[in-house]
Amino acid sequence: MAGADELVQKLDVVLTVFGSRQGASPLKGREKEGGKEMQNLHAHSVFCDGKSTPEEMIRACLAAGMDSAGISIHSPLPFANGWAAKAENVAPFLAEMRRLKAAYAGRIAVYAGVEWDVLSDTKWLEPFDYAIGSAHFLPVGGDPAAYPTVDDSPETTCRFLAEAFDGDSDAAAECYFAQLRRVADAPRAQVVGHFDLLTKFDEKERFFDETSPRYRAAALNAMDALVSAGKVFEVNTGAISRGWRTTPYPSRWILEQLRRRNARVTISSDSHHAATVDCAFDDAQRLLEACGFEEIWAFDGRAFVKRRIKE
């Protein structure tokens, strides 16, 4: 286990390795193969921290061959934050989504969603067609506005491991998965977002030991609670389009554990730009097949229904 001093010393190396990645161009999504049905529910627009309008995102989903698509706004938080939606943006977002549902009826099914953070008020689960439940923060220290974000940057990860956990990455993982487990207590949150988000930067600079018994116990305890609550787990390609990873969340061993539990899964891009709405969907599908999955689950406007991976 790396100590605090060692983690701090890693910072310059991390910045050197990742520095050019921050401005990397998004990977372009692949075209749909073989006429298969596709859906993306995790996509952010200019109503929170996205770069494209909802209509631009919907048009991109149409161009990618999708039969349905959801645009998800980040839930407002009870403290200042740079990426969450402001409370006053929710009503205009819902109004725009109603307009798009009508405008694109018969061409693509359009859904209004929310990515609900476990630190947000549960009222933000109510006015949407569906909800993705996620954990982004580690509740350490007394001021929620100063809670570290697990997916901010490699240097932030170095700092919170050193300063908040004295270099104990397993303790940080236990804290994260305890937060994510709270999604099980939110019935309106049907989907679990990026299950192991804290591993975002681990391909080039390993911060977390996923083989550690403590790490695995924390992850599996959260998984069991979420599976028991009937949640759908997303296979999220967002870190691929941002240049941080070459494989989706969650890690393969987690997918294998989900398969053993007969968990439901869906594929999503966590896109923040119209160019990435279907990034690496084919790769995610092949990974699921390799892990033994035969079905993915798609939202039909009322509930999640099965779709065969192989047509």
Q: What is each model feature region?
A:
Residues 1-13:
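Extreme N-terminal basic, low-complexity initiation segments
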Residues 11-13, 33-118, 199-214, 262, ...:
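An N-terminally biased module of ancient metal coordination in phosphate/nucleic-acid-related enzymes
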Residues 42, 61, 131, 194, ...:
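Conserved, mostly hydrophobic/aromatic
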Residues 69-71, 131, 192, 233, ...:
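Hydrophobic residues within beta-strands of alpha/beta enzymes
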Residues 83, 89-228:
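Extended substrate/RNA-proximal surfaces in nucleic-acid metabolism proteins
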Residues 210-218, 247-256, 282-283:
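Charged helix-capping and loop-helix junction motifs
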Residues 276-311:
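Mid-to-C-terminal alpha-helical segments outside catalytic/metal-binding sites
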